[in-house]
């Protein structure tokens, strides 16, 4: 497994690098400044994109210029030209893993009561386990 930088990691990096530190971020402040700061070097090293043979993975998708966008929710796949091969993304929860052309959307809302999903580009296999949340608030979520 590869840990990719996503919008929450970037938000924490930005908070730790700002003059205000964690004081303006109640969620991150729970970590405690010294505890959070020890993670900063690792967070800064997280890749935005992981590239495999004929595929890549990124947290949320790509903007119109083909740059990784950590918080995009627009259907970027509608204009995707295939330049990166198959693209595996998360970020936007869906009731099930979806394949939209060369795009594979794997966020199945574990935090909202859905499954935690993993995808293998080499075999097209999907593995799912029950998420920790017990109340399925994501529309259409069923058992894994």
What are these regions (language model features)?
Residues 1-20:
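Core catalytic region of metal-dependent phosphoesterases/phosphodiesterases
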Residues 14-116, 121-144:
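Acidic, His/Gly-enriched loop-helix segments that form or flank divalent-metal centers
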């Amino acid at each position: 497994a590869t840990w990719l930088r996503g919008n929450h990691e970037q938000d924490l990096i930005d908070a730790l690098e700002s003059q205000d530190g964690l004081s303006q971020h109640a969620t991150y402040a729970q970590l405690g400044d010294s505890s959070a700061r020890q993670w900063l070097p690792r967070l800064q090293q997280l890749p935005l994109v992981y590239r495999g043979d004929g595929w890549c993975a990124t947290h949320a998708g790509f903007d119109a210029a083909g740059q990784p966008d950590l918080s995009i929710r627009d259907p970027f796949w509608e204009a995707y030209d295939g330049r990166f091969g198959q693209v595996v993304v998360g970020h936007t929860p869906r009731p099930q893993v979806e394949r939209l052309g060369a795009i594979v959307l794997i966020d199945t809302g574990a935090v909202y009561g859905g499954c935690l999903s993993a995808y293998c580009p080499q075999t097209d296999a999907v593995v799912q386990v029950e998420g920790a949340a017990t109340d399925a608030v994501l529309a259409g979520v069923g058992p894994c």
